[in-house]
Amino acid sequence: MPKNFASDCPGESTLFLRKYQMSVQEKRSSSHLYYIPPWHLDRKYGSCSTILLDNSTASQPDLRHTLESVALAIYYNIKHRYANRSLAIFEEPVHPLPQEKLPGKSFKHDPKRNCIFRHFCTLFQVIKLTAPCAIVALVYIKRLLTSANIDLCPTNWKKIVLGTMLLASKVWRNHGLWSVDDSQNSKDTAVENMSKMEKCFLELLEFNIHVSASVYAKYYFDLCALANDHDLYFLFSFLHKDKAQKLEAMSRLCEYKDLHQDAAALKRVISMNFIGIGCSNAILS
C-alpha cells in the first residue's frame, strides 16, 4: 500500500507557499518593517452589486495564469532549498535533456522566474499539456522531494518537471504511462533514458499517483494566493446574461448528476437491506 504523504492533507500548507513565506520573512527582517507589497496599497475594493468574473475555475484553469503561478512555485522551491541533494538519473549534467551537453556554467546559478516560465511555455506547446496537469505535477513534485529526500536544484529541476508533467498528463487523461507518441520528445530525450526515469519516478512515488479533489483544490487556491501576492491577476469581465445562463446550466447539470447519484445510492442501500431476507410462510391459527 502506498503511504500517505503529509502534503496530501487538505489542511496542510503547500511546500511552495511555505517557501514563499520564507522570502517574505527575509524581506521583513532585512527592512525591520512589516512587509506590505506595494500593489496592496493602491488596490481598490467595490461594495456595489456589480459582479466581475474571470475565465478560470478550478476544473478549467486559465493556462497562462497557471503556468506563471507554477513557475513562481518552482522558483521558490529552488531558491529556498535545504541543500543540493539529488539523484543521478535526474541530474541534467549526467543525463542531459538535449542531445548535446550544456556547459557546466548553466547550472551554477538558480534559474530566474522568466526562464522557468519560458521553459514551461515551450514544454506545454510541444507536448500539448493542459493547465490541470501543471497543478497535479506540483503535487507529484512535493511527493517526490519528500519520498526521495532530495531538493529542486539548478541541475535537476528541468528533468523533474518534465517527468511529473508527463505523468500528470497520463493520469489526467486516464491513459497508460509514458509512451513515445505522447512524449513527442525523441529528438531531445533518449527513449531509454525516459523509460528509466519513468520507472524511477513510480518507484519513488510508491505508485501513489492518485490526487484527491481536496488536494487539487488546495494547490489551486494556494497558487491563486501566490499569484495574487505577485500582482498576477486574471482579466476580469462583467457578468453578462449569456455567461450567467451558461453558469446556471452548468450548476443545474451538477445538481442533476448529484441527485441521480444520491437516488442510485439510496436504491443500493434499500436493496442491500433486503439481501438475505427470504419469504417466510404465513402461519394461520
From Swiss-Prot:
Organism superkingdom: Eukaryota
Domain Cyclin N-terminal: 111-209
Example of a GO cellular component annotation carried by this entry: plasma membrane
Coiled coil start-end: none
Chain ranges passing through the membrane: none
Entry's Gene Ontology BP terms: regulation of canonical Wnt signaling pathway
Signal peptide from the UniProt entry: none
Pfam families: Cyclin_N (PF00134)
PANTHER family named among the record's database cross-references: CYCLIN Y, ISOFORM A
Protein family according to the UniProt entry: Belongs to the cyclin family. Cyclin Y subfamily.
Name of the protein: Cyclin-Y-like protein 1B
Organism: Homo sapiens
Gene responsible for this protein: CCNYL1B
